[in-house]
Amino acid sequence: GGELFIELGYDRLDDRFLPTKGMYSQLKYTSSRESLGADLDFDQIEFSIYGNHTMGRHNILFGGVFNTTLDDDIPIYGIYTGGGFLNMSGYEQNSLLGANFGMVLAGYRYEVAQSGFLPGYVGTTLEYGNAAAKRKDIFSDGRVNGSVYFAYGTPLGPVYLGIGWSEDRSAVYFLRFGSVFGANSLGRR
């Protein structure tokens, strides 16, 4: 590939790993050009937004992703993927594929242990979206899914252990270490 891009980001989360308040947003325009070594000329727009609000031990998470390809023909490296924790949690990582990807989510997390070496949380999410060849099919042919999980904040980063579910598949189990917020985790290609 050969791409030029411009990216705008806004990050006011109080913690990259287990945030309790703030917002994260990213907007990116990518122009892939044959003159730069790409297989095909194509353009893509990616947008994501996530927010957190805490009241005592209760935390609310909300967010969404909308990634779209502006051209009809793209090479395989330009395809968006979905699946995995907080990115269509009811599906295996990278199991949803398409030239376009979008999802919305709402989540709740409860702080079980407020102090100590390993603060613990239990949470759940409800997510809706899909990957599709056509932009209009992302939400019109969307899939309901979500997760139930335990999270622990460790000195090396958070550990998430849980189960994802969807309306058309059996359960997906996950164990995840590290950040779930940011360009390399949520709304990734």
Go through the PLM ranges and name each one.
Residues 127:
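Acidic/histidine-rich, metal-coordinating catalytic segments
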Residues 135-189:
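C-terminal beta-signal and terminal closure region of outer-membrane beta-barrel proteins
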